[in-house]
C-alpha cells in the first residue's frame, strides 16, 4: 500500500495512520532553489545527530520553499518554509520537529487545537535537549542551551 498523495479525507488519514503504525518511512525530499536546499541541509544534519530523522521521515514527505509564512501543510504531509526564515539551524531543526509532531497528531486523530501546540512545543524542547546531549560540538551545545533558555522563559510574572 502506498502513502496517499494527500492526507485530507477520512479514508486518506486512515490509510496514512495504518502505514505509519506499520513502520512506513517517506523518502524525504527538499524542493526549492539551490540556496534553499543547501540551507535546509544544516537543520537536517542536526536532526540526524539527535536521532530524530526517522521520526521526521515517518510523517513528512517534503520540505518545500515558499514565499510566505512557514507552516505545516497537513494535506500534503509537507512543511512549507521561507528561505528567509532559515537563519538559525538549531531553531530551524526545532521548527521542523515541532511541525512533524503536529503532523503525527493529525494522522493519529488527536485534537490539533487547545493542547496540540503544547505537545508540539514539548517535542521541540525534547529534541533540543537531546541534541545538546548527543552532539560533540561545543558551539552546538552552547546554542542549544541558549535556545532552551529562550523556550523556557516565562513571558508573564
Sequence positions of predicted segments:
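Short, solvent-exposed mixed-charge patches
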Residues: 1, 156-157
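Auxiliary, metal-adjacent structural segments of Zn-dependent hydrolase domains
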Residues: 2, 12-77, 84
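Stable alpha-helical elements in mature extracytoplasmic
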Residues: 39-43, 92, 96, 116, ...
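Sec-exported extracytoplasmic/periplasmic mature domains
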Residues: 48-52, 101, 105, 125-133
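Short pre-active-site segment immediately N-terminal to the catalytic Zn-binding motif
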Residues: 80-95
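Active-site recognition of the HExxH zinc-binding catalytic motif
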Residues: 93-107
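Post-HExxH zinc-binding segment in Zn-dependent metallohydrolases
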Residues: 108-147
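Short, low-complexity, Pro/Ser/Thr/Gly-rich segments in the mature regions of secreted, periplasmic
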Residues: 146-156
